[in-house]
């Protein structure tokens, strides 16, 4: 009886010690993380006090959210939680995420340029790129008043099977039409100044999922959608009065020939440097620009990479089979100039010392509103402008050796005047480079519309 009572007291004391220790640990501010490596996001900040939020109860609610979101050793605890779930035997099972609702794609529809204008684009006088730790994909956030732009480039659709995750595309007729009109309007604005090229890059699901799976998930045929976009652009150009029409780049046909190669990550929504390399050569051949052979590039590898799709799903199947990142180091161009924090900064074109979990930021220093490379071995005054989202980050190093000047703007954050910029820099080639997801996302389409309105 006595030993039983001692055991009960020991158990109570141990429980109390753990409880008190956890409380004390939770209040040590120096241990509270500001970012989450495993989720790839900035954690909730401690709220600023004001009387209105205090009286409404919002202030105390935000403190509770901050306390829970920034608990010390948060990532370690998440990893342990994932490991425990893996012991349940569910880690490698098929997992279906959000099922979107796609519009019907009519390949035989009539395209009429003159119609009522769409909704006005967002007004963002000083759009801000994501933090150094973040880079994203085409991106569902629509609140343009937020302190930072959206960090996720998804339309909230994903499909996990085994060690691979795919973003799913849901065709939206109005958004795709607005995307096409932006490209054609840019060609009209730049008519006689520069030739406009349009490259819509398929995402990995386009080559990996069967028609049966697409029907089951309600997802759209991405390759057919790209062909539809190019058909619309070709039809709109003469109606709009463009004398130098948009040149469409059917790289989806090229990438289909290499679909069994490592051209997409399994745990991230981006393409790999190899995928960007194939499409860059297709583009450079079309514009008759020289480029180095693949053997002339030094290859640098990050061995372990768990990307945005892992952070989105926290799938054990992905965690057990991480990606790797190959980066091709240009033989001639080592640096890129970016615009960040209101100043121009020189960064490595390929960063060999990325410390964050998001290794994709090694390409062109991640997401910024403006980029510029200079190749001293070419003195012909040639210049290229890339209008891009984050897929363009891996593309910039692939064309840096082919032009004296390569400029790139991320339309999600850049607020300049397109025509004035092209004229000022003497640019004669403009490339719209977007992954398929960007064409059916309201935020990215509205940001694109700012370029031509």
Where do the language-model regions lie?
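Extracellular glycan-modifying ectodomains
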Residues: 1-453
């Amino acid at each position: 009886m006595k030993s039983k009572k001692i055991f009960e007291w020991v158990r109570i004391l141990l429980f109390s010690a753990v409880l008190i220790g956890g409380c004390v640990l939770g209040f040590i501010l120096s241990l509270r993380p500001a970012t989450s490596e495993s989720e790839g996001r900035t954690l909730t900040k401690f709220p600023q006090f004001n009387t209105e939020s205090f009286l409404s109860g919002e202030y105390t609610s935000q403190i509770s959210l901050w306390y829970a979101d920034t608990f010390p050793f948060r990532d370690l605890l998440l990893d342990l939680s994932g490991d425990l779930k893996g012991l349940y035997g569910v880690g490698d099972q098929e997992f279906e995420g959000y099922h979107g609702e796609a519009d019907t794609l009519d390949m035989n529809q009539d395209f009429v340029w003159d119609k009522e204008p769409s909704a006005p684009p967002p007004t963002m006088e000083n759009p801000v790129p994501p933090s150094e730790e973040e880079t994203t994909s085409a991106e569902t956030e629509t609140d343009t008043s937020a302190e930072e732009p959206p960090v996720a480039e998804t339309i909230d659709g994903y499909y996990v099977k085994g060690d691979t995750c795919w973003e799913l595309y849901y065709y939206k007729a109005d958004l795709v039409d607005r995307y096409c009109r932006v490209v054609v309007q840019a060609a009209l604005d730049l008519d006689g100044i520069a030739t406009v090229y349009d490259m819509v890059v398929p995402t990995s699901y386009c080559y990996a999922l069967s028609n049966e799976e697409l029907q089951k998930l309600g997802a759209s045929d991405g390759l057919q959608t790209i062909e539809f976009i190019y058909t619309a652009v070709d039809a709109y150009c003469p109606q709009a009065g463009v004398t130098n029409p948009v040149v469409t780049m059917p790289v989806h046909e090229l990438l289909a020939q290499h679909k069994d190669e490592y051209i997409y990550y399994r745990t991230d929504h981006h393409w790999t440097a190899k995928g960007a390399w194939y499409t860059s050569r297709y583009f450079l051949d079309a514009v008759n620009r020289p480029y180095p052979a693949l053997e002339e590039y030094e290859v640098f590898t990050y061995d372990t990479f768990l990307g945005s799709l892992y952070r989105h799903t926290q799938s054990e199947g992905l965690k057990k089979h991480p990606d790797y990142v190959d980066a091709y180091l240009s033989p001639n161009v080592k640096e890129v100039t970016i615009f960040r924090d209101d100043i121009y900064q020189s960064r490595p074109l390929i960063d060999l010392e990325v410390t964050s979990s998001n290794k994709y930021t090694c390409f062109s220093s991640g997401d910024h509103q403006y980029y510029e490379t200079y190749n001293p071995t070419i003195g012909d005054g040639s210049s290229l402008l890339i209008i891009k989202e984050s897929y363009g980050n891996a593309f910039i190093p692939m064309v840096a050796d082919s032009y004296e000047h390569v400029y790139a703007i991320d339309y999600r954050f850049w607020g300049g005047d397109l025509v004035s910029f092209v004229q000022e820099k003497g640019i004669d080639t403009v490339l719209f480079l977007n992954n398929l997801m960007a064409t059916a996302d309201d935020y990215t389409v509205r940001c694109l519309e700012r370029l031509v309105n």
